[in-house]
Amino acid sequence: MNFVEARNLPGHVGIIMDGNGRWAQLRGEPRVAGHREGALAVRRTVRAARRLGLRALTLYAFSEQNWARPEEEVDALMQLLREFLLSEKDEILDNGIRLNAVGNLGRLPALVRAVLDPLRYESEQNHQMTLTLALSYGGREEIVNAARELAKAVAAGRIRPEDVTAEALRAQIPSLSVGDPDLVIRTGGERRISNFLLYGLAYAELYFADVLWPDFAEKDLFGAIASFQARERRFGLVGSQSGNTCAPDAAAPVDSAPADASAPIARIAV
């Protein structure tokens, strides 16, 4: 039996939400039907993350390379994104969630920005959890942009070449404003990173799930976090040096969630 413990939670979880198209194809439906079901999985996952007490959740919603998909699919995705933001606005604001977005946001259509930008502003003082949507996003592109900003600063004389450090570069990377990811989950059965949070992934734990994203449920998130908590994170050291294990202690198991489903979980069996 595995357990999730509140005291050993990853601070920042990233999810590569893969499998919407295959989910639809398996049912003989258009790909957009899978994306629509995927939006419901986002809602479930955000609720579960908040219930667990996660500090930050980053969802890979649309990559820079996804613009090359058929125009009809891209248009449907943008419309669905707008609908999702509108439908989730009250839940975000009422539950202390700060909405963030990273990526080449200038490429997003006006119909999305008209909803996304005000909601980011309205929620910026919320502190229960930060929900980051990676939109028109690429990890390599993010690193290049960060390096370019430092190069400009050196050229302008604002900093010296020796001031260009790993931390200086990291400070220019928007996706890491909530910290490096501790755990990255990929659904859909593939075993790759797909240009996601590349700079911050140095010591992240990776979890690959076969479940397609539209079927991703609370139990799947809990299972991924239970796996994370059972690992020893060494950060390049040997185990005796790090003293950093995520494994839970041997307390009595809890077989069900608290009666108040919105309350943070202390310990739950999965």
Predicted feature locations:
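Flexible, compositionally biased loop and terminal segments
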Residues: 1-270
